[in-house]
Amino acid sequence: MLETLTVVVPAFNERDSLERHLPRWLAWCASHEALLIVVDDGSSDGVEELLAAHLTDRRLRVFRHRGNRGYGDAIKTGIYRTETPYVATMDADGQHAIEDIELLKEAMLREGADLVVGARPANQPGGGYRRLGKAVIRRLASLLFSMKIRDLNSGMKIYRTELVKQLLPFCPGSMAFSDVVTLAHLNLRCVVGEVPIQVVPREAGKSTINTMTAVDTVLEIINVMMWFRPLKIFLPLSGLLMVLGTAWAVPFLAAGRGLSSIALLLILTGLMCAMLGLIAEQMAAGRRIDLPEVATTELKSSG
């Protein structure tokens, strides 16, 4: 039987969770023509030994990083080694239900999507700072990318393998991977869908997400914006500086005191930002990739 889907699970010190859920994941893969790739990101709690004990199952492939390289790099390792037309990702902490991947795949086939995101409930468990961080990231992405994805950093997604492999070089190896890979699809005008999924509380292990994760994600979003659409950052900044400079200059000019040095500095800095933005846009245009053939379909007569 030819498999069409591979599920990639990055794991770092998630032995207890994998021990609980791995048999169920493998059973699901067996009944849905799917393969499972688990990437051990340098775990030190016995994940390697646990996974080795399950390698008799032909549907399981295991890759191990010698050191902890990061969530995004673990996902990249799995996707680069995927050979099926579709690849899904989910977290190793057991909060995702592997059964929801079928919903994402159905939506992808139905809508002809290039990426489908599993949207978690808005009232999911989490601290106030964590929810605030997600809201800030979502708002920033909305302003810079004109996007309307509700759960930008969900770990459960399904991709067209050929397309996502071409976007991986633009994505970071950190926790920001989930946000950036979605934004990369949106920036290239790919068809991105979203399907509600359920999450359950973590039963074992401890989350590694913290405040610095949100800071890193914001910086990576700005970095992606600079790579793809730098004018969206430089032009607003330029306009703001020039407006401030003009507003500062008007009272001095009206009083006959000439042009203020501060006003001149603000206006010149604004002009420099505009010029830098144009140069950056030209550089971005030179390295911008074209949509691959997988994102293009040909309409044929039904007769």
Language model regions located:
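Short beta-strand/loop segment that forms part of the nucleotide-sugar
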Residues: 32-43, 63-65
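Cell-envelope/extracellular polymer assembly enzymes that use nucleotide-activated donors
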Residues: 4-6, 35, 180
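Acceptor/aglycone-binding surface of glycosyltransferases and processive sugar-polymer synthases
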Residues: 63-81, 86, 98-175, 200-217
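Hydrophobic helical membrane-anchoring modules
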Residues: 1-2, 176-303
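A conserved acidic beta->alpha catalytic loop
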Residues: 40-49, 94
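Short, well-formed alpha-helical segments that are part of the catalytic scaffolds
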Residues: 14-28
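Donor nucleotide-sugar binding loop of glycosyltransferases
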Residues: 14-17, 43, 71
